[in-house]
From Swiss-Prot:
Keywords: Apoptosis. GO terms for biological process: anoikis; cellular response to starvation; cellular response to UV; negative regulation of apoptotic signaling pathway; negative regulation of autophagic cell death; negative regulation of autophagy; positive regulation of apoptotic process; positive regulation of apoptotic signaling pathway. PANTHER family: BCL-2-MODIFYING FACTOR. The keyword Secreted does not apply. The gene is Bmf. Changing L138A: Decrease in the interaction with BCL2 and BCL2L2. It comes from Mus musculus. This is Bcl-2-modifying factor. Residues 1-28 are annotated as: Disordered. Interacts with MCL1, BCL2, BCL2L1/BCL-Xl, BCL2A1 and BCL2L2/BCL-w. Interacts with the myosin V actin motor complex through its binding to DLC2. Belongs to the Bcl-2 family.
Length: 185
């Protein structure tokens, strides 16, 4: 059994800019020529598994393409049309106001010499962002593989129980024939 060719058919929203448009830089990291865009038509999603959008989230797709089946309109802002996950009735509160966030301890990997307001170079930001998105996509693929493996394991276990059941039924119903050795052999 050969592995499914799901990776080639995935929608490559990893290499799109934030506004959902494919990159226009020729030869750059966000170039649309690197990967062909296709619909989300993965063979794994046909096996009664969740489609990729359920485990990866909407990604960087435009709002019109987001899956709104798991979202509800927020009662706090019906005029703005803000979508919230099912079961959430209010928008999240801001954790910090003003400059209170600057008082948090810095992670050990943070460079000590750079000021807090300084932005990293744009190329480094795009590279980091693409790496994070690739990692999320790989995690999503791994989750689907795990679900498929678990489903196949469950089917094999069910098949084994049916074989045991049919064997016992054959023994119980055909006791005399089994004792005499009557059969196709």
């Amino acid at each position: 059994m050969e592995p499914p060719q799901c990776v080639e058919e995935l929608e490559d929203d990893v290499f799109q800019s934030e506004d959902g448009e494919p990159g226009t830089q020729p030869g750059g990291l966000l170039s649309a020529d690197l990967f062909a865009q296709s619909q989300l038509d993965c063979p794994l999603s046909r096996l009664q598994l969740f489609p990729l959008t359920h485990c990866c989230g909407p990604g960087l797709r435009p709002i019109s393409q987001e899956d709104k089946a798991t979202q509800t309109l927020s009662p706090a802002s019906p005029s703005q049309g803000v979508m919230l996950p099912c079961g959430v009735t209010e928008e999240p509160q801001r954790l910090f106001y003003g400059n209170a966030g600057y008082r948090l301890p810095l992670p050990a990997s943070f460079p000590a010499g750079s000021p807090l307001g300084e932005q990293p170079p744009e190329g480094q930001f795009l590279q980091h962002r693409a790496e994070v998105q690739i990692a999320r996509k790989l995690q999503c693929i791994a989750d689907q593989f795990h679900r498929l493996h678990t489903q196949q394991h469950q089917q094999n276990r069910d098949r084994a129980w049916w074989q045991v059941f049919l064997f016992l039924q054959n023994l119980a119903l055909n006791r005399q024939e089994n004792r005499e050795g009557v059969g196709p052999w």
